Amino acid sequence: MSSLVTPQHAEELSTGARQLGVELSAEQHERLLGYLALLIKWNKAYNLTAVRDPDEMVSRHLLDSLSVMGFIHPDRDSWLDVGSGGGMPGIPLAILHPQKRVTVLDANGKKTRFLTQVKMELKLDNLTVIHSRVEAFQPAQPFNGIISRAFSSMENFTNWTRHLGDTGTQWLAMKGLHPADELVALPADFTVESEQALTVPGCQGQRHLLILRRKA
């Protein structure tokens, strides 16, 4: 274990994952802690996250990401994390689902350099890192799932990623407060499939997940 990661961090991750109903293998637990160590190390120079205190990163980043894993459909094997930043939730998604192809996209070159380093050091062969504005990204095939965490408004999220999915794609938007005002401006060809209130161990404040579909 890296000297940047404490036994308390390891225990908090184990306990929090159990509370979320997420079963972590020893390898997944080790990789998540390895990711945490890289995040702590690189954040000092690269400003990857506004969370400066390493003791807050387990709950606010790792467990927050794990809180949506139960909504990742087992049959959807290609996922895009839009505006991934420091890699949430894309890196935990790639660690927990090695059989799925996960793409993390960000327009900030420093952040994609960090994500590339994470891919190399953690040997995440199922992870692809893309340095691009989302509007300019043109994948060969539509993604089965598109996810974002605090990326933008619901209107922008759906409009900017419309070309990256199709009517079979699920869009997952991770939010804090329920975005009722944003849903009013949702494009007419998108519909809310479900809304989930999430409880993240160690996190104060509201968390919500909205799952969207595009109409045929």
Curated annotation (Swiss-Prot):
It is found in: Cytoplasm. InterPro entries: rRNA_ssu_MeTfrase_G, SAM-dependent_MTases_sf. Keywords: Cytoplasm, Methyltransferase, rRNA processing, S-adenosyl-L-methionine, Transferase. It catalyses: guanosine(527) in 16S rRNA + S-adenosyl-L-methionine = N(7)-methylguanosine(527) in 16S rRNA + S-adenosyl-L-homocysteine. Pfam families: GidB (PF02527). SUPFAM superfamilies: S-adenosyl-L-methionine-dependent methyltransferases. The keyword Methyltransferase applies. Specifically methylates the N7 position of guanine in position 527 of 16S rRNA. This is Ribosomal RNA small subunit methyltransferase G. It comes from Pseudomonas putida (strain W619).
